[in-house]
């Protein structure tokens, strides 16, 4: 007689993916914040010196996580996505190779550890012109305030980007603005 079928390993939750990515980045020497804006706009923000990386996590819906990483590129020097399995990660790489999403790092979680299928690459090559330089500088100031305690961890701040056309002169592409955190008197 055979016993019950072996249980299939359960798929990790998004919280598990974020935790694994946070631990992975901390081991690499980054200071890491999970949901630093209190609005769940940024899943993870990692900083080492002046370098800022952003990580978006999704258990399913790979297209959405890639779109999120592309939208958030204005604030980080690099972005990565972390998904629940190697097959999903491989699908993301196959769909994004040769596209503007190719610099996005693609990671998956295996038994609680992050595996990198494609490492994250900088959005702007060394010496290249950075169309988001001002936004990245402002975002670093927000991270400085978080690191120093001037902006308490877990405090809600308006870091969610808004599509505006001011700098583009209305030429049809959206640019992003980072709202400064506000202090209560």
Regions found by a protein language model. Give the residues of each.
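Acidic-basic catalytic patches of nuclease active cores, encompassing PD-(D/E)XK
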Residues: 1-40, 47-49, 100-102
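Non-catalytic C-terminal interaction segments of nucleic acid-processing enzymes
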Residues: 3, 98-185
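Conserved catalytic cores of phosphodiester-cleaving nucleases, focusing on short active-site segments
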Residues: 21, 44-61, 80
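Short, well-structured alpha-helical interface segments that form or flank functional binding sites
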Residues: 16, 39, 63-67, 137
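Short, solvent-exposed polar/charged micro-motifs at secondary-structure junctions
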Residues: 42-46, 116-119
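Catalytic cores of nucleic-acid endonucleases
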Residues: 59-111
């Amino acid at each position: 007689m055979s016993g019950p079928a072996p249980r299939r390993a359960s798929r990790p939750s998004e919280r598990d993916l974020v935790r694994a990515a946070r631990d992975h980045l901390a081991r690499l020497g980054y200071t890491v914040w999970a949901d630093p804006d209190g609005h769940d706009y940024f899943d993870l923000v990692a900083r080492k010196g002046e370098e800022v990386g952003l990580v978006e996590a999704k258990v399913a819906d790979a297209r959405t996580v890639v779109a999120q990483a592309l939208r958030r590129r204005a604030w980080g020097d690099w972005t990565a996505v972390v998904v629940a399995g190697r097959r999903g990660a491989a699908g993301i790489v196959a769909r994004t190779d040769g596209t503007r999403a190719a610099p996005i790092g693609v990671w998956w979680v295996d038994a609680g550890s992050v595996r990198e299928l494609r490492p994250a690459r900088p959005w702007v090559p060394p010496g290249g012109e950075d169309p988001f330089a001002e936004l990245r500088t402002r975002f670093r100031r927000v991270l400085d305030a978080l690191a120093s305690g001037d902006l308490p961890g877990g405090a809600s701040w308006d870091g969610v980007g808004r599509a505006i056309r001011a700098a583009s002169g209305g030429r049809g592409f959206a640019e992003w603005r980072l709202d400064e955190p506000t202090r209560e008197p």
